[in-house]
């Protein structure tokens, strides 16, 4: 929690592995309810959130990782009634829908990175031979930040036309 509160500026948060009563924890942390929810998890956490949404809440659904490897995926949303009562808006979110903005986004994000306005953490695992365990660990949540596998050191050749060199053809 220190990382998300101190480094990223969130007011609060919780580790889903440290409680089995998500609704109680969310009520404690969000006593006035939830206005905005970015859902890439699905399952019991989303069920708990939906019981606490405020009137005209907005929900972006990007993924359902809790369901990806399930032998018996959840049967439909049990919270449609809440959406109606709370007049909430749910919209699917795919990054590809913004493909025509990629160049502009890359420029802006690069600027923000240089200015240190965007914060991130990388969790680097050394060696391709460790990739399978790194992937499994990522799916089980044993990392903080972006999980990367470092395959090799990057080296450059002194030959003209090699990676990293600019060649002018006259």
What do the predicted segments below correspond to?
Residues 1-170:
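Terminal helix/beta-alpha structural elements that buttress the NAD(P)+-binding lobe
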């Amino acid at each position: 929690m220190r990382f998300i509160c101190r480094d990223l500026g969130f007011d609060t948060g919780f580790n889903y592995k440290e409680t089995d009563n998500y609704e109680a924890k969310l009520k404690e942390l969000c006593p006035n309810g939830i206005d905005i929810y970015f859902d890439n998890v699905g399952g019991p956490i989303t069920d708990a959130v939906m019981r606490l949404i405020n009137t005209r809440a907005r929900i972006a659904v990007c993924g359902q990782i809790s369901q990806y490897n399930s032998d018996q995926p959840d049967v439909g949303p049990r919270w449609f009634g809440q959406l109606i009562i709370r007049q909430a808006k749910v919209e699917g979110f795919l990054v590809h829908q913004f493909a025509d903005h990629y160049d502009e986004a890359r420029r802006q994000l690069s600027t923000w990175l240089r200015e240190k306005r965007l914060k991130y953490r990388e969790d680097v695992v050394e060696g391709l031979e460790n990739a399978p365990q790194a992937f499994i660990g990522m799916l089980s949540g044993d990392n903080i930040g972006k999980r990367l596998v470092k395959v090799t050191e990057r080296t450059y050749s002194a030959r003209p036309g090699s990676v990293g060199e600019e060649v002018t053809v006259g």
